[in-house]
């Protein structure tokens, strides 16, 4: 699942390219979950030929083992490692990439906003923005949060109803109800428990 989540960072490059056309390079992201005894370390390098700032982040496998089926927790773990790494390494290239220097702090702020919006980081109140569920189709919700920990089907007034729950973290559960309308599951309501 980590590789599926890591693919989300590709969208950030598209956002940057549109917002900062003056950047004369792209970002490349690689996320690896490895045993800490492997000795492989995180690194960053600039590929001058392809004009890519490559950020290669290693994360300890033991952090992910309890959450094999919990995509939301995996995102949070990745965000916890990635954002400080990104900030530190990109600031280190401020003098080496002249196009980056004038927009560096904006790029960092945009990355933070992107990570909050995509549930890699909690917001300023320390909570995940679970309201993103309102903008997702049923399929996107399942993709975003992974398999629900609870799924029940009922019928009300001739309409099929599906109640779903996801354990987001130790303190948070997301509950959502969908109704089958015109062969499409539509969000009826959701709440943070």
Put a short name on every predicted segment.
Residues 4-9, 14-30, 34-193:
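Residues within mature, well-folded domains
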